[in-house]
């Protein structure tokens, strides 16, 4: 989602609260609970869940491994739920031609650097750059090249929905709005 006027361009970023993250966090949580229940059932010698007959599974080594996978899955699931709760990666990009300032804001993990706020003058922007990697896992990333700072990504590296035409159009619109050149690598 973005908002544009003659002098200001604001682009809101979704972050980690995506449908896919909710799906995988739920699947991982339920699957790891199943593994943990089977491991606990094999330790106790009776079925905790009637759907999962685990009396044939010996506690050592299968039950131990199932319990380990269950605990590991719960930790990974907790990590996913925390990133969703904290909305890591969300924020906005604001380009203000009137003031000549570009502001990039992102939410991170809790701590000292939870809020990532970058501010640049427009005259320090050298170009808008598109990095294209084709192949089995294609990537198209939009960067803003800043004098003395290097390249700053404007799109997430896991956004695979961009077709070459979409990323090129977005880069061209942004380069036109900022009145700077566009490069493709």
Curated annotation (Swiss-Prot):
Subcellular localization, as worded in the UniProt entry: Plastid, Chloroplast thylakoid membrane
Q: Give membrane topology per the record.
A: Multi-pass membrane protein
Q: Does the keyword Membrane apply?
A: yes
Cellular component terms, GO, for this chain's entry? chloroplast thylakoid membrane; photosystem I; plastid
According to its UniProt entry, the protein's GO biological process terms are: photosynthesis
Q: Which UniProt keywords apply?
A: Chloroplast, Membrane, Photosynthesis, Plastid, Thylakoid, Transmembrane, Transmembrane helix
Keyword Ligase appears in the UniProt entry? no
InterPro entries cross-referenced by the UniProt entry: PSI_Ycf4_assembly
A Pfam family the protein falls into = Ycf4
In terms of superkingdom, the source organism counts as Eukaryota
Database matches in PANTHER family: PHOTOSYSTEM I ASSEMBLY PROTEIN YCF4, PTHR33288
Name the family: Belongs to the Ycf4 family.
Function of the molecule: Seems to be required for the assembly of the photosystem I complex.
Protein name per UniProt: Photosystem I assembly protein Ycf4
Task: List the source organism.
Answer: Oryza sativa subsp. indica (Rice)
